[in-house]
From Swiss-Prot:
Gene source species: Clostridium pasteurianum
The UniProt record lists the keyword Cell membrane: yes
Subcellular localization, as worded in the UniProt entry: Cell membrane
Major localization listed first in the record, in broad terms: membrane
Top-level taxonomy: Bacteria, Bacillati, Bacillota, Clostridia, Eubacteriales
Protein name (record): Probable transport system permease protein NifC
Encoding gene per record: nifC
Amino acid sequence: MENNKKILESSKKLSSYGDGESRFSFLEKILAPLFLALTAIYFVMLIFPIISMIRYSGGSHIIQTLYDQDNIKTIILSFVTSLIALIFTFIIGTPTAFCINFVRNKVLSKILDIFVEIPVVLPPAVAGIALLLAFGKNGVVGNFLSNHGINVIFTSTAVIIAQFFVSSALYVRVLRDSVKSVPIELFEVSYVLGAGKIETIIKIMIPMLKKSIVSGLILAWIRSLGEFGATLMFAGNIIGKTRTIPLQIYTYMQDDIKMATAFATILYIMTFVLLLLVRLSIRDDD
């Protein structure tokens, strides 16, 4: 209702501009080409560096990259750790997104939203330091684990934790926004029919929002695959153990830029394909 009122008010304002039609027509002739030019500049700035990278890497180097044993280990490690992080993201992030929406206290709800947003905007190095201090031997969690003979830092587990920390928020945000768009009447009808909140979520909401769930998970997976700073600070750069694709690119940049760009091209292609799946999923949902 509020959106409809805003649309009507905007329409009235536009209709009141009839006297200045010639003035706005003149401005449109100037601004329309300017907008197109700025849009073209924006996409050139986005696309040209990527084209340059692909041209520089060359097809032979990309193929050579895929035959290197260390690179194969890196790719396998990246996929395994990111998929495990994705499973935890779904298991933990799904109820979290619903619980945030069910919080009645607006202040508490906003505070929880801020905590969800922080990993998205936090510099990766800061996230790495925070995880290092929390899970280190002197940290609260790390000290407890150390007393039980469990070491997390500089292990594959640390990679999974870092990937989960930086990527899960994307999934929670997508699902939270989708839940907010569901009419409140749907919940009320479900309650009247005798279903509880959990039953409503499992039997009605999750099947209804499956496209949003898939899209959010793919976005989180992309973020996990591209995670660099927090992983480097928290898990290190150990081949076959903690060296993911971004860390392998970082390592190659020190002495073999051709291989670095070839690996970067592979990561770009993977990201593009996954984002394309997200777009197709959203289009099908619409």
